[in-house]
């Protein structure tokens, strides 16, 4: 399997525009399309089809697809044999090539929103992990966290930190560390929700 670069992780190939032309040379409309052009188009559409097949069921339902293509993708998800899956993906590729440019662009736009949401969730989890690591490493971080999240149960937080440190020292399973992660997650979620709840009143003030 090819290693995925940082750039390709953030901007997957299936989100790149699929440029399809009926001719090979703009200066000579009679020139047939080259093999390399056809290969690029086929590969781009295959990547798009593979990305669709890999979507969770709830997300796939949100993508604007012709019924025949949606049915083919659902069938591909049910196939377990390698050869059967390969043939089904070839069929999906054929259906993808029958789509209009507008159809493809609409699909790409929805997939781009999924990628954006996944990146935001990943960033949120990293923020939680960073807070947990800081809390375990530095008592000063506890004071900073409480100041940033005043609704935090201070005693419970300090107990979790103390127990997690002790577990690490004794080589025990990180039960308290996992509980600390959840506590930080809830605190950050509460902070975000408080910000959202404050927005309507700000809008009302602006409109007054």
UniProtKB/Swiss-Prot annotation:
Molecular-function GO terms, alphabetical: ribosome binding; rRNA binding
UniProtKB keywords: Cytoplasm, Ribosome biogenesis, RNA-binding, rRNA-binding
InterPro entries: DarP (IPR006839), DarP_sf (IPR023153)
GO cellular component terms listed in the entry, alphabetical order: cytosol
Acidic residues: compositionally biased ranges: 195-208
Residue numbers spanned by region Disordered: 1-41, 167-208
One matching Pfam family: DarP
The keyword Cytoplasm is assigned to this record: yes
Localization in the cell: Cytoplasm
Principal subcellular localization: cytoplasm
GO biological process: assembly of large subunit precursor of preribosome
Protein family per UniProt: Belongs to the DarP family.
Function of the molecule: Member of a network of 50S ribosomal subunit biogenesis factors which assembles along the 30S-50S interface, preventing incorrect 23S rRNA structures from forming. Promotes peptidyl transferase center (PTC) maturation.
Name recorded for this polypeptide: Dual-action ribosomal maturation protein DarP
UniProt source species: Ralstonia nicotianae (strain ATCC BAA-1114 / GMI1000)
Gene name for this UniProt entry: darP
